[in-house]
């Protein structure tokens, strides 16, 4: 499992005994440690253990978080365990928070690929169907979702419109459990995502 992760520990971790919040990044192209460090310096985020899934790793998010919990001093409250992802890994992060809120309670989902590997339109999106079929949504979790307006991301607006309607119909409220943001000028690429991760983490932190 070690080969599947790159770990950045907060200052003083190795000589201390306190537990810390966790940020697990499922896309190694996101400079999550740098962005989290900047937000920490601004007082937005607490000191966090930042773990990045290695490129090419086939380990699932649930496996990685379970390993991290048993290996590092991570806070027990699930709201202190965050995830972020892009495209298909954003869909993975969203699923984990909804299906295993005991493992992770926050997720920043950038350019979520609701169409899946099969490229399904909104009406046939497997992830949207899963959401519609749920009898209830977990409480105490928060999801940040965004999509751009250029290239592939331009096609994501109807998916996000539908997911917003589903979440509201099941009792969630905008800016309480979730936020959906249309990132003007945003696109489906790492340069755009790294500019959008900060605002996502800031919202998850309540700032």
Regions found by a protein language model. Give the residues of each.
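Non-catalytic cap/lid and distal C-terminal segments of serine-dependent acyl enzymes
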Residues: 1-207
